[in-house]
Amino acid sequence: MDFSDIAQRGLVLLGCGKMGSAMMEGWLSSGLPAQSVWVIDPHPSAWLQVQDIHLNAALPSDPALVLVAVKPQLMQAALPQMSRFGNGNTLFLSIAAGITIASFEAILGPHAPIIRAMPNTPAAIGQGITALSGNRLIEERHLVLAEGLLGAIGQTLRLEHEAQMDAVTGVSGSGPAYVFYMIDCLAAA
């Protein structure tokens, strides 16, 4: 993946728990310079604290991408601080469960290109499937960038309509849990 635009302009992670850390680890090992990454996280992990990134520091003026990875219940408090980047130059990529594109547009404004992505649990070990859906401002280059970044945690699937996200979540999100349960039952038999 070509990280040149991100390396020059920066990537902001709003929240960096298990999924965000798994992605960042993949990006750094694939050549993204650590100094191109800004993380806003009130409770950073020990791993995150030893990375050579900008942790809870002043943000770049025009980042290439803001990855929103906060828990849904924290979204209303966390996202407004990113609204200054809603001018159309910065791509917003959300992996926050259950938060619609319309919810992001209400906070970020009508000019922000937004992609909603829903990774499943196996993504934490790089074997996931992530469904993607974007707003009307999304161009092919945005999808290519999102797919390249999300490739760090597995495969991606483009959806035609955001409404399909619920169906995908039911199958890809719950499916692995059922398989793991079935394996446990077979092992116990």
Annotate each predicted stretch with a short phrase.
Residues 1-57, 127-128:
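NAD(P)+-binding Rossmann beta1-loop-alpha1 motif at the extreme N-terminus of oxidoreductases
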Residues 3-6, 31, 59, 85-87, ...:
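Solvent-exposed alpha-helices and their adjacent loops that cap or buttress functional pockets
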Residues 16, 20, 63, 75, ...:
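A general structural signal for well-ordered alpha-helical segments in protein cores
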Residues 23-24, 45-47, 56-132:
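Rossmann-like NAD(P)(H) cofactor-binding subdomain of soluble oxidoreductases
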Residues 68, 93, 135, 157, ...:
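Glycine- and other small-residue-rich loops at beta-strand/loop junctions that grip anionic moieties
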Residues 85, 103-113, 129-167, 180-189:
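Internal alpha-helical scaffold of NAD(P)-dependent oxidoreductase catalytic cores
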